[in-house]
C-alpha cells in the first residue's frame, strides 16, 4: 500500500479527491493527571491491564491480536469496542528498542494493511531490526468495527454525481447525494459514529502502548497520521517517545481554510505535472506551456461533464467527477505521471478506462464492485473532528471564487465537496486549536515543499506550534518524504528513531 494515496479531502466529496484534513479534535474527555505517569487513567485499569492473545495472522512473519477499548471513554462501563492489532517482531541484529507504531493516514486507511504490505517490509532495515513494527486499525476502520454506509452500486452512483453544479437542479442533486450518504452511514453504523474521533483513537493508542510494555510511544505517522500523532502527544506528553510526523497538518485551521489550502496544493502539484508533461513529445495536454495544459485539462473536464465517455465498465461511464478523481489520484506521486499521461490521452480518444482505473484505486474499489470502508471511515472521522466547512449550498456558492483563485483547475469541485459534513447525523465534537504538547520529548515534523495533500506551510505551522517540534524539509514533489528515495531524509529520521537525536531544526534535504 502506498501511503501517498491515503489522505483524503476533508469533504471526501464526490469525485474531488484530495485528502483529509481535520484539525485538532477536542472531542471526548481528556485523561486526568494520572495518565502522565505509569498508572492507568481512572476507570480504565481493566483496559490497561488486559492481556493480548497473539495469534498467527495468515501472513508470514506477522502476529495479530484483538484489543478491547471502551466505546465511550467518558462512560467506560457502557461497553467495549474490539480493535485489531498486528505486529512483526524486530528482526535483529542489535538491541531491541521497543515497539514502533505506524499509521498511514486517511483517516480511514488501514494501518494493518499498511504494516503488512509496506512498512514492515519497506522501512529501512536498521529500523526494522531494532523495533517491533506494530499497527492498530483505528476504530471504525477496516478490521476494527468498520463504518459502513452504502452498497457498491450506491457508491458507484455517489462517485459519479456532478461535483461542479451549474444550476439549481444540479445543486439539489449533489446535496441529495451527500444527504443519502450520511443517512446510509447512520442506518448501517449509527451506534459507532459518535465514537470514532481522533481523540478516541489517540487514547486507544495509549492503551496499546501499555499492553505492549512500552513506557513511551514511538510512532511514525504519515498524512492524517500526523494529526493523530500530534493529538497523542498533546494528550500524553510525558508518554510521547520518538514521534515522526511526515506530511503534517495544521491543527489550528478550520475546515474551510484547510480545504482551500489543499485546493492550492493540488493546483501546485498539477503545475509541476504540467511542466513535466509539456516537455514530453506525447503530452496529451499540449507541448507549449503549463497555461495551455491547464486550459486543455479544464476543457476535457467540461467535455466529460457534457458527455461522459465509455470506461470499459458497461455500468459506469467516465464523467467529470471520476475524471477529476483520477487526475488528483496521480498528483500524490510523480511516479504516477506517466500513467496519467496515458490515461488523459485515452480520454481524448473517448477511452475512459485509464482515468477510471486511477479513480478506482483512489476510492479502493475492487474489480468486483466492492469498496473498502476507507471513504466511509474518512467521512465519519472528519465530520466528527471538525464543524462543517459550509452549512448550506448558498455558503458554498459564495466561497467558490476564493477556491477558484486558489485553484483554477480544481477549485470549484473542492468547494462543493466541502459541503458533505453539513448533512452528517452526528454533531462534531472537535474544534481547531493550537497543539503544543508541552513537556513532550523532541518531535520531528517532516514537510515536502510541493506536497499536494498536506501543503508545506502546514508542516511549518505544526512544528512551530509544538513546544518541542523540529522541522525537517524535503525540497521536492509528492506526498510525504520518508522512504521515498532521499538519503538525507531517511538518514535523519533513522538517526532519530535509533539514537534519539533529532535533526537540527530547519534542516533541508533534496
Write out the residue ranges for each language-model feature.
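Structural motif
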Residues: 309-324, 332-336, 368-376
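Gly/Pro-rich cap/lid or specificity-loop segments adjacent to the active site
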Residues: 33-322, 380, 384-510
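Flexible "cap/lid" loop of the alpha/beta hydrolase fold
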Residues: 249-267, 343-345, 352-367
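C-terminal motif of bacterial Sec signal peptides marking the signal peptidase cleavage site
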Residues: 20-23
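Bacterial signal peptide processing site
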Residues: 25-28
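Long, low-complexity segments enriched in small/aliphatic residues
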Residues: 353-386, 390-391, 396
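Bacterial N-terminal signal peptides that target proteins for export
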Residues: 2-14
Amino acid at each position: 500500500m502506498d501511503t501517498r494515496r491515503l489522505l483524503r479531502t476533508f469533504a471526501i466529496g464526490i469525485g474531488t479527491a484530495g485528502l483529509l484534513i481535520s484539525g485538532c479534535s477536542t472531542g471526548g474527555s481528556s485523561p486526568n493527571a494520572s495518565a502522565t505517569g505509569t498508572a492507568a487513567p481512572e476507570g480504565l485499569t481493566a483496559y490497561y491491564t488486559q492481556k493480548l492473545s497473539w495469534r498467527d495472522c495468515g501472513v508470514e512473519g506477522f502476529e495479530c491480536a484483538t484489543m478491547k477499548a471502551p466505546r465511550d471513554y467518558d462512560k467506560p462501563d457502557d461497553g467495549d469496542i474490539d480493535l485489531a492489532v498486528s505486529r512483526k517482531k524486530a528482526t535483529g541484529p542489535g538491541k531491541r528498542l521497543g515497539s514502533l507504531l505506524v499509521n498511514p493516514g486517511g483517516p480511514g486507511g488501514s494501518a494493518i494493511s499498511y504494516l503488512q504490505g509496506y512498512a514492515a517490509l519497506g522501512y529501512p532495515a536498521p529500523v526494522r531490526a531494532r523495533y517491533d513494527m506494530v499497527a492498530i486499525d483505528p476504530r471504525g476502520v477496516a478490521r476494527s468495527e468498520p463504518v459502513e454506509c452504502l452498497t457498491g452500486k450506491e457508491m458507484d452512483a455517489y462517485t459519479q454525481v456532478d461535483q461542479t453544479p451549474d444550476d439549481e437542479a444540479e445543486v439539489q442533486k449533489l446535496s441529495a447525494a451527500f444527504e443519502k450518504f450520511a443517512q446510509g452511514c447512520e442506518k448501517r453504523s449509527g451506534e459507532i459514529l459518535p465514537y470514532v474521533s481522533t481523540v478516541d483513537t489517540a487514547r486507544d493508542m495509549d492503551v496499546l502502548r501499555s499492553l505492549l510494555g512500552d513506557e513511551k510511544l514511538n510512532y511514525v505517522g504519515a498524512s492524517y497520521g500526523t494529526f493523530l500523532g500530534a493529538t497523542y502527544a498533546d494528550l500524553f506528553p510525558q508518554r510521547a517517545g520518538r514521534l515522526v510526523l511526515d506530511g503534517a497538518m495544521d491543527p489550528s485551521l478550520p475546515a474551510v481554510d484547510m480545504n482551500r489550502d489543499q485546493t492550492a496544493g493540488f493546483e501546485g502539484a498539477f503545475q509541476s505535472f504540467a511542466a513535466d508533461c509539456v516537455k514530453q513529445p506525447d503530452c496529451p495536454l499540449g507541448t507549449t506551456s503549463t497555461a495551455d495544459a491547464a486550459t486543455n485539462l479544464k476543457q476535457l473536464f467540461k467535455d466529460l461533464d457534457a458527455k461522459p465517455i465509455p470506461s470499459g465498465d458497461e455500468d459506469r461511464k467516465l464523467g467529470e467527477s471520476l475524471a477529476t478523481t483520477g487526475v488528483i489520484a496521480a498528483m500524490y506521486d510523480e511516479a504516477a505521471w506517466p500513467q496519467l499521461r496515458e490515461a488523459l490521452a485515452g480520454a481524448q480518444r473517448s477511452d475512459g478506462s485509464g482515468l477510471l482505473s486511477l479513480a478506482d484505486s483512489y476510492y479502493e474499489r475492487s474489480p468486483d464492485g466492492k469498496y473498502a470502508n476507507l471513504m466511509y471511515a474518512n467521512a465519519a472521522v472528519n465530520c466528527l473532528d471538525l464543524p462543517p466547512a459550509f452549512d448550506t449550498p448558498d455558503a458554498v456558492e459564495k466561497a467558490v471564487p476564493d477556491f477558484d483563485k486558489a485553484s483554477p483547475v480544481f477549485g470549484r469541485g473542492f468547494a462543493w465537496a466541502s459541503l458533505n459534513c453539513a448533512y452528517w447525523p452526528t454533531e462534531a465534537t472537535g474544534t481547531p486549536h493550537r497543539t503544543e504538547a508541552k513537556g513532550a520529548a523532541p518531535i520531528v515534523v517532516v514537510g515536502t515543499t510541493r506536497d499536494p495533500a498536506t501543503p508545506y506551510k502546514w508542516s511549518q505551522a505544526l512544528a512551530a506550534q509544538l513546544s518541542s517540534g523540529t522541522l525537517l524539509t524535503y525540497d521536492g514533489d509528492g506526498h510525504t518524504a520518508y522512504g521515498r528515495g532521499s538519503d538525507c531524509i531517511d538518514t535523519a529520521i533513522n538517526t532519530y528513531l535509533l539514537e534519539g537525536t533529532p535533526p537540527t531544526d530547519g534542516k533541508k534535504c533534496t
